[in-house]
Amino acid sequence: MKTKEINVPVICIAEFADLLAEYDLTNEIMGSTEAGEIIVEVQYEKEERQAVFELLELVEDYSADDN
């Protein structure tokens, strides 16, 4: 099993959580960053990589909007 730590902007946490539930990925909230992002640890198998890429893309889209 692989693990990925993702910093999720608060503005997209609901959408992020929906994707986690949709793909039934094991996850844990680890804390928050100084910037107010929520640190989420996601555990996944190799076959679930595409779901993790989707999560990362969502976060990147919201992060790009902030810049």
State where each predicted segment sits.
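N-terminal acidic leader/helix
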Residues: M1-E34
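Hydrophobic beta-strand residues in large extracellular and virion-surface proteins
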Residues: I6, L20, I38-V42, L55
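Helix N-cap motif at beta-to-alpha junctions
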Residues: P9-I13, Y44-R49
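Short amphipathic alpha-helices in soluble, non-transmembrane regions
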Residues: L19-E22, A51-D61
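Conserved short beta-strand edge segments in small beta-sheet-based binding/regulatory domains
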Residues: N27-S32, E57-N67
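BRCT (BRCA1 C-terminal) domain core and associated BRCT-interaction motifs
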Residues: G31-E48
